[in-house]
Amino acid sequence: MLRLAPNGNLRFLQSESFEALFGGAEANVAVGLANFGIDSAFVTKLPKHEIGQAAVNSLRRYGVDTCYIARGGDRVGIYYCEKGAGPRPGKVIYDRAGSAVSLSETSDYDFTAALKGADWFHITGITAGVVKTDVIIQALEAAKEAGATVSIDYNYRSKLWTRDEMKKVMRQIVPYADVFIGGDTDACDLLGEKPDDPMRTLYEKYGFRAVASTSRESISASDNIIGARLITDGKEYFSKKYPVRIVDRVGGGDAFDAGLIYAMLNGYDPQYTVEFAVASSCLKHTVEGDFCIAEVSEAAALADGKADGRVLR
């Protein structure tokens, strides 16, 4: 997507110009993994015009494979992002109707070729709210056929659809997952009930390899305390709590996903996996834009408790 944002902490109503960047949930994960040294590819549909090409170039810049991106249609999805500060929360306005990817069909993609030899496939509920369900299911079936691990981040967005609308779609999609990322309310949506421990119940009902959820204590829009929980092999693991001074919180959950995927691909033990994933998310909160521009060594230093903010010379 194209992200248009007022400069600094200006509000929408004040702004006479907008900063233009590109991002989006799965794209953010792909870039995060590429920055961690993982071969990553991104599949979507974008127009052939210059704005569509600029979106492609924004991924290529970080080494993401774009050769399976379908080209056509007229619009790139847009979202407007107003940063929060102190007691004032941030705001997002979506303008995605009629985007190339929202109108795309199964015939636009060759998921079998795109997923050949893939170890992992990641998708989110944001995409499920925009892209036709049969396209998503085709991608998931190709991923399972390729033997890839499938992760799904529930990622409910109230400005895209209602929870009831989302439940109908996600209950078709989530059974394909090996790894589920979400929160207690998301788990209750899928379960149709409110157990004492929704994520544990979901983990057991679906037989996932792992489930993960992040926690966020909001001191203000500028200061949060971030942590996470991971359930795998029947056991649960909690990360440390990390205080974060926020530069840009958009993409923080996607950076968590990238860190989780990286750690699991590399066979990290569960405790270090959740620490690394949260460290990745914390680093993203300090970076402007959607993408997590961080190296493995930086996330590892934070996860190991060795990051002190001093200048590295």
What are these regions (language model features)?
Residues M1-D65, A85-P87, S104-T106, F238-K240, ...:
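Glycine-rich phosphate/adenosyl-contacting loop at the front of the ribokinase-like
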Residues M1-L2, K48, Y156, D186, ...:
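Short, glycine/acidic-enriched loop or turn micro-motifs at the edges of active sites
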Residues L33, G183, G253:
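Short, conserved phosphate/pyrophosphate- and ester-handling motifs at nucleotide-, phospho-/glycolipid
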Residues S58-R60, T66, G84-E236, P243, ...:
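Ribokinase/PfkB-type carbohydrate-kinase core domain
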Residues Y68-V76:
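A short, structured active-site edge motif that brings together acidic residues
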Residues G77-Y79, K83:
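Short alpha-helix plus adjacent loop in nuclease-associated cores
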Residues K240-K306, R313:
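Conserved post-catalytic alpha-helical subdomain immediately downstream of the catalytic base
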